[in-house]
Design a protein with these regions (language model features):
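Mid-domain Rossmann-like dinucleotide-binding core that forms the NAD(H)/NADP(H) cofactor-binding site
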Residues: 111-180
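Glycine-rich beta-strand-centered segment in the early N-terminal region that forms part
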Residues: 6-24, 35-76, 85
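Cytochrome P450 core scaffold surrounding the K-helix E-X-X-R motif
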Residues: 27-33
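Residue-level signal for nonpolar/aromatic packing positions in well-ordered secondary structure
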Residues: 52-54, 67, 101, 120, ...
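NAD(P)H dinucleotide-binding glycine-rich loop of Rossmann-like/cofactor-binding domains
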Residues: 63, 73-140
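A local structural motif
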Residues: 1-4, 158
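Short, conserved catalytic or interaction motifs in soluble domains
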Residues: 59, 103, 165
C-alpha cells in the first residue's frame, strides 16, 4: 500500500532528508516478508539506508546544513519499535546517523554504503575486536559485505586472506587490498 504523508519536520538533533536513492539489502526483504527479528509496528515503511539532500535541520544540529548531500542509516531501536523508512520520498533521522558525501559520488552508490560497511565494521571491531597484525579470513570476499570487510580489515592493519570464485572476482578482491 502506498500512502501520502505530510512533509516531515525534524526535532532537536535531527535532519529531514529528501531521499534520492535507497539501498536494498536482505534485511529489507526480511522486514517486508515478516521475518525480521523485531517486526516494526504497522503501518511501516521499509528501508534501512538512503542518500539524498538535507531539507531542514533541527535545533542543535552541527556540521550539516540545508542542501548538504548525505547518506543515512535509519535507526533500528531494539526496544520493540522500529524506524526504517528509506523507501519514502523523505526521512527524518538523528544527525548522528548521517555522513556527508562528495559531490562526485552518485546517490545510488552512497545509498548502498551504510548497511554493507556498517555490518562489516561492527563485525570486525565490536564482535571480533580485530587488532593490527592479526589474520582475517573473509569468505565471499567479492560480495558487498565481504568487499567491505576486506577494506576495513586492511585499514585496521590485519593480514587479509580472502576467498572468491573465479579469476575476475579474485582480481577484484586483490585490488581491494586482500593479501592472499
Amino acid at each position: 500500500q502506498v500512502n501520502e504523508l505530510a512533509d516531515l519536520q525534524p526535532a532537536a538533533n535531527q535532519v529531514a532528508i529528501q531521499v534520492r536513492a535507497a539501498g536494498v539489502n536482505p534485511a529489507d526483504w526480511y522486514v517486508v516478508n515478516g521475518f525480521f527479528q523485531l517486526p516494526p509496528a504497522l503501518p511501516a515503511t521499509p528501508g534501512f539506508e538512503a542518500a539524498g539532500e538535507i531539507l531542514s535541520v533541527g535545533a542543535g544540529v552541527e556540521g550539516f546544513a540545508v542542501g548538504d548531500r548525505v547518506l543515512a542509516v535509519l535507526p533500528y531501536l531494539n526496544d520493540g519499535t522500529a524506524t526504517f523508512g528509506a523507501f519514502a520520498e523523505q526521512v527524518v533521522v538523528p544527525s548522528s546517523h548521517i555522513l556527508g558525501i562528495p559531490a562526485n559520488m552518485e546517490f545510488v552508490t552512497a545509498a548502498a554504503i551504510p548497511v554493507m560497511y556498517g555490518t562489516a565494521h561492527i563485525a570486525l571491531t565490536r564482535r571480533a575486536q580485530l587488532q593490527p597484525g592479526e589474520t582475517l579470513l573473509v569468505t565471499g570476499a567479492s560480495g558487498t559485505t565481504g568487499s567491505a570487510a576486506v577494506q576495513i580489515g586492511k585499514r585496521l592493519g590485519a593480514r587479509v586472506i580472502a576467498t572468491a570464485s573465479g579469476s575476475e572476482k579474485v582480481a577484484r578482491v586483490q585490488q581491494l587490498g586482500a593479501d592472499v
